[in-house]
UniProtKB/Swiss-Prot annotation:
Record's keyword terms, sorted: ATP-binding, Cytoplasm, Kinase, Nucleotide biosynthesis, Nucleotide-binding, Transferase
Name of this chain's protein: Adenylate kinase
Top EC class, one word: transferase
UniProt domain comment: Consists of three domains, a large central CORE domain and two small peripheral domains, NMPbind and LID, which undergo movements during catalysis. The LID domain closes over the site of phosphoryl transfer upon ATP binding. Assembling and dissambling the active center during each catalytic cycle provides an effective means to prevent ATP hydrolysis.
Swiss-Prot/TrEMBL catalytic activity: AMP + ATP = 2 ADP
InterPro entries (alphabetical): Adenyl_kin_sub, Adenylat/UMP-CMP_kin, Adenylat_kinase_CS, P-loop_NTPase
Lineage, uppermost ranks: Bacteria, Bacillati, Bacillota, Bacilli, Lactobacillales
Record: residues binding ATP: 10-15, 128, 137-138, 195
Family: Belongs to the adenylate kinase family.
GO annotation terms (biological process): AMP salvage
Source organism of this protein record: Streptococcus agalactiae serotype Ia (strain ATCC 27591 / A909 / CDC SS700)
Stored SUPFAM superfamilies: P-loop containing nucleoside triphosphate hydrolases
């Protein structure tokens, strides 16, 4: 089974990806892991990626696409199938993935989209606070500290509501075009992500069993 998992930051995509891998035994292909492995193994694309990263530059799409292609061509993919997590990030990468799969004789069986209302995600992502003295991380709503005093805690710039909203807006714009592409191919299953983790996975599992 060859799958793609999508979802906005904070939607719980990583948690569900781990559960899918555990339950269905597919190879988990996350962008970060792929880059680290390609650079550690000094593959052609790994060396290219490292040359950009060492200069503090963004890795161009053709290199990212090449690293994905290298990974999808490995033997375990034909045996186990895969779950792509964090790629494609743009519609251009989605088209490149289509071409790669066709070239390798693979096909995408389904796209799992973990849906959570952006306003809920802003609450999830912007609630993180850090204790100035201990460095411990808490959440204003979901994991509040005992005896909370505002002056004892600070919030990272990345976690402030306005920053979180800007980040989500970018992700929504990019994600919608990718989802539309896969919807036209009849591959997308939307999963309600604003429920307990076990309930989300029950819905994911049901959808995947129907694909088998």
């Amino acid at each position: 089974m060859n799958l793609l998992i999508m979802g906005l930051p904070g939607a719980g995509k990583g948690t569900q990806a781990a559960k899918i891998v555990e339950e269905f035994g597919v190879a988990h292909i996350s962008t970060g892991d792929m880059f680290r492995a390609a650079m550690a193994n000094q593959t052609e694309m790994g060396r290219l990626a490292k040359s950009y990263i060492d200069k503090g530059e963004l890795v161009p799409d053709e290199v990212t696409n090449g690293i994905v292609k290298e990974r999808l061509a490995e033997d375990d993919i034909a045996e186990k199938g895969f779950l792509l997590d964090g790629y494609p990030r743009t519609i251009e990468q989605a088209h490149a993935l289509d071409a790669t799969l066709e070239e390798l004789g693979l096909r995408l069986d389904g796209v799992i989209n973990i849906k959570v209302d952006p306003s809920c995600l802003i609450e999830r992502l912007s609630g993180r606070i850090i204790n100035r003295k201990t460095g411990e991380t808490f959440h204003k709503v979901f994991n509040p500290p005992v005896d909370y005093k505002e002056e004892d805690y600070y919030q990272r710039e990345d976690d402030k509501p306005e920053t979180v909203k800007r980040r989500l807006d970018v992700n929504i714009a990019q994600g919608e075009s990718i989802l539309e592409h896969y919807r036209k191919l009849g591959l997308v299953t939307d999963i309600e992500g604003n429920q307990e983790i076990t309930e989300v996975f029950a819905d994911v599992e049901k959808a995947l069993l129907e694909l088998k």
